[in-house]
Amino acid sequence: MRMLRHLLLPMLLLAAAFCFAKDKSKDRFLQPGPIHIDKAGQKWADKTLRKMSPEEKVGQLFGIRVNAQFLNDADPIWLQLRDNLDKYHIGSLVMSVPVDGAVLLKSPPDVAAELLNRLQKSSKLPLIVAADFERGASMRLTGTTVFPHAMAFGATGKTENAEVFGRISALEARAIGVHWNFFPDADVNSNPANPIINTRSFGEDPKQVGDFVAAYIKGAHEAGMLTTAKHFPGHGDTATDSHLGLAQVTGDRARLDTVELPPFRRAIEAGVDAVMVAHVTIPALDSEANQVATTSTSIVTGLLKEDMRFKGIVVTDALDMAGLTRLYMKDIGRAAVESFKAGNDVLIMPGDLDASYRSVLQAVQSGEISRQRLDQSVRKILELKASLGLNKARLADPGQLSIEVAKPENVATGQRIADEAITLVRDNGKVIPLQSFTSPGTAGAGLPYQSLTEANNRLVVVILSEDLRTDSGRMLERQILARAPNARVMYVDARSAAGMTPAVVEAVQAAEHVIAAVYVVPTAGRAIRAAGGGLKNSVAMNDSTGSLLTAILDHAASRTMVLAMGNPYLVQDFPAIENYACAFSNVSVSETAAVKAIFGEIPITGHLPVTIPGIASRGEGLERPVRSSSAQPISGGSSHVQP
């Protein structure tokens, strides 16, 4: 008996150690490194796949949305998330943020990391966490390095900017617990009326777009981030937002081969990890009526996997977008089934998770989807997880946040890129840089909301915002008042434009210099232009703010510098614009860059990465040197006017 006890004790200890080891990944911090699957990772993927039930395999296909926010353990949102992971055997998360109208309710990175770690611990298998970090983590979180929109990178003409952007974004994302970026955007923005791509694209030239795409992939891979080329086979030549309706690419196959597809081929050559398929119809590739690329076997399997020989992960765009859901109103679950049958591996953000999961599972059980086809995709997903090291450790190390996120040198890099992007298209009034002058009256800080009669009107700044609840214009105002404390800053949006027009017109009539900063950026799922409106741009100003800008130009066109803090094409709607500069983005670094350029503190060296029909061709841009050091800044008191 004693001998038996001596034999049993080591065996029990070994068994206990083995059981403990199986769960160690839930308690270990994942150290980001090269994306590579080793023998142990391959063995884990094979073993895990063999043990999985059909229900678990189907669950691995789905990526569900999680908003980065603090959640109490008893919060219904947390309980639903936790239960969904278990009930549907979810394979991936798509990190986003809560939205209140036009306002993104962003959280700091530590809140996001803590929530993602809790979800990782709650999941039987490690989760891949994806995000739309098109402008880096700052697109979804506060306190991170800010980068401008992709088109700003195109305006710099320097692919090395995209590479360093990829590296910094990856370092910050991995520190937070995000492994997979739905970027770079490989769309060629060849249609100025495109309502959803616009400044999200690097430009209109297929080669330039491809070069920037490849550079971003290289940088992101250096810091261990999975990348995604989107929106296959091209969303740049559409005139409809696929979040709102059915978009169509009308070009023939020859045009697709020379314009839309080259950046995706370049991405594949660069080793992109995933390709995201768009909810767009392309008659030249699939002539079936209302057949979107997402559910087209000819496009996903025939073109992407076979003709272009892409071996990585194929992921859908969000399945809750109207461009897809309107085609499956009677049976929303079929959208997921048809997407998977077409060749997609990962199905993200279904409009109805339960219906989508059950529909795919039923299709597997009935034989409509073969077990072999299911295993192919699940194996790719498991191998992707192992290539990240998630089989060994799955938690983000909170200690890395203060090391990797918002490093001063990285913040400076984001600002430098925004500076280099500023593009001067017109300067007929010779207003750049602003000439020095001395403001009359008493210098010093004025009270906010002063009446017009009390304020100094030598420099008037009109911020034409899409919604005053957003941060648009705040950094621009701070930077201008730091240089010209007596400037009058007036905020206007669609709801206030009509009432503010008399006051704005009175101010600009008396002003020596006027800056009109126009904030218009492509925003998913929001109709920007009112039906029947007179403006022809799809990413355009609201008619009321457009009318106000027209009034400003009627009274002070030669003295007004119009800043495009987003869509560069909007100048088409206002032929009276005499002075025009593009920042290509509404983020804080672009606001700072625009002010620095106006005051001559930085050279203006950007060149248009797109053609503005009837205005300027791609590659054009007026260059300006730094202002002479002998010039003096504008001085005086401050005034801030809001409705």
Tell where the protein language model's regions lie, with residue ranges:
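Bacterial N-terminal signal peptides that target proteins for export
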Residues: 1-8
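Second-shell residues forming the walls of enzyme active-site clefts
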Residues: 50-53, 80, 103-123, 127, ...
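Structural recognition of the beta-strand scaffold that forms the well-ordered cores
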Residues: 60-65, 91-96, 126-131, 135-137, ...
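Solvent-exposed loop/turn segments at secondary-structure junctions
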Residues: 67-71, 99-102, 134-138, 186-190, ...
